[in-house]
Amino acid sequence: PSLSYNSEKISVSFEKGLAYKFFDDGKVSIAASIKPNLRPYKSSYSTDLAGMKRSTFYDGVLNVSYQMSRGLKAKLAIGNELTTEHNGNGADLSLNQFIPIFGQPIIFTAGARWYDSNRANYFYGVNSSEVSGQRTEYAPGSTTLPYLSINTFHPINTHTNLFAGVNFNFFPSNVVNSPIVKRKSSASVVIGLNYNF
């Protein structure tokens, strides 16, 4: 379950944190937020991760969006980690295209996330203190991770929507070469109900 609150300038949600929109002229919008990031993994997920500790952290983020044309929007988010878990920076650049197909709204997104070396190491690296017989020390350096997603929603009544999404993430060679990464890509599916009060 997830709860969110949205007004003209302020939004609060588990996924995006606390955001304040301080500019919006209908074409360009600019907002600042404090965004939570769940721990990338737990050591209990795999024997390959035994002894490796990662925690939830928070970013200060500047979000900019630009409505390029009807249904086409560009988004840029630039973030800096605030909780000193890794002191890393990141950015996310994407294009969103809204297309109605047989009356069903479909949103296609293509983008890329950039992580500086500190952030990439927190997600995919192995520190000297984490070396074991199963893994060697590894620092991926800064990295760029392309992604694609397809999302849709369907109104059930005036308050309730059914939503679904498919997400694909692609890992570059400096991530794939990490001893704790076993795949070149990942995929996820989300299906749920959204209720508006």
Regions found by a protein language model. Give the residues of each.
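Membrane-embedded beta-strand positions of outer-membrane beta-barrel proteins
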Residues: 3, 14, 30-32, 64, ...
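Outer-membrane beta-barrel transmembrane domain signature
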Residues: 82-163, 167-175, 180-182, 195-197
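Flexible, solvent-exposed coil segments and beta strand-coil junctions
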Residues: 8-11, 40-44, 55, 69-77, ...
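Glycine/small-residue-rich interface belts in oligomeric ring/scaffold proteins
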Residues: 1-34
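Repeated loop/turn-to-beta-strand initiation elements of outer-membrane beta-barrel proteins
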Residues: 9-12, 28, 70-74, 103-106, ...
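Transmembrane beta-strand segments that form the barrel wall of outer-membrane beta-barrel proteins
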Residues: 10-19, 45-49, 72-82, 96
